[in-house]
Amino acid sequence: MRVVVQRTREASVTVAGEVVGQIDHGLMLLVGITHEDTEKEVEFVADKIANLRIFEDEEGKMNFSVLDKGGQILSVSQFTLYGDCRKGRRPNFMAAARPEQAEPLYELFNTKLREKGLQVETGRFGAMMDVRLLNDGPVTLIVES
């Protein structure tokens, strides 16, 4: 499992001209699932992200998590995170899980975040989406299982 985590002041995702998910202060997550991922990886990554201390305290030190700050999550599935660009000029996506495997794990990931008390908005799995965000910092990290 691979998740790009971006600290954001605001973010939204649009499908066919309709806003399907929108948050204010919090984290924008681009979520990739690979063949080997199971519930164990999902739980590990959800816990890691919920408790990752990437929000600053009064002294500018990253000391608070999205939970501590009462932030929100915008979670967007993105199989292209498993694109392999080492050979040729076209990415190979063979490492990305097939939709029938990835979608239940993506939904479980969002459920695990909600169970921790986070407000989670999502994109639409498998859809072409327009994602907009105002990156705060910028702070961008990659979390992997």
From Swiss-Prot:
It is an enzyme of class 3 (hydrolase). Its main location: cytoplasm. GO terms for cellular component: cytoplasm. GO terms for biological process: D-amino acid catabolic process. It holds the Pfam family Tyr_Deacylase. It is found in: Cytoplasm. It catalyses: glycyl-tRNA(Ala) + H2O = tRNA(Ala) + glycine + H(+); a D-aminoacyl-tRNA + H2O = a tRNA + a D-alpha-amino acid + H(+). A motif (Gly-cisPro motif, important for rejection of L-amino acids) lies at residues 137-138. The keyword tRNA-binding applies. InterPro entries: Daa-tRNA_deacyls_DTD, DTD-like_sf. One of its GO terms (molecular function) is Gly-tRNA(Ala) deacylase activity. Its EC number is 3.1.1.96. Keywords: Cytoplasm, Hydrolase, RNA-binding, tRNA-binding. The keyword Hydrolase applies. It comes from the Bacteria. Belongs to the DTD family. Homodimer. HAMAP family: Deacylase_Dtd. NCBIfam families: D-aminoacyl-tRNA deacylase. An aminoacyl-tRNA editing enzyme that deacylates mischarged D-aminoacyl-tRNAs. Also deacylates mischarged glycyl-tRNA(Ala), protecting cells against glycine mischarging by AlaRS. Acts via tRNA-based rather than protein-based catalysis; rejects L-amino acids rather than detecting D-amino acids in the active site. By recycling D-aminoacyl-tRNA to D-amino acids and free tRNA molecules, this enzyme counteracts the toxicity associated with the formation of D-aminoacyl-tRNA entities in vivo and helps enforce protein L-homochirality. A Gly-cisPro motif from one monomer fits into the active site of the other monomer to allow specific chiral rejection of L-amino acids. This is D-aminoacyl-tRNA deacylase. It comes from Brevibacillus brevis (strain 47 / JCM 6285 / NBRC 100599). The lineage of its organism: Bacteria, Bacillati, Bacillota, Bacilli, Bacillales. The gene is dtd.
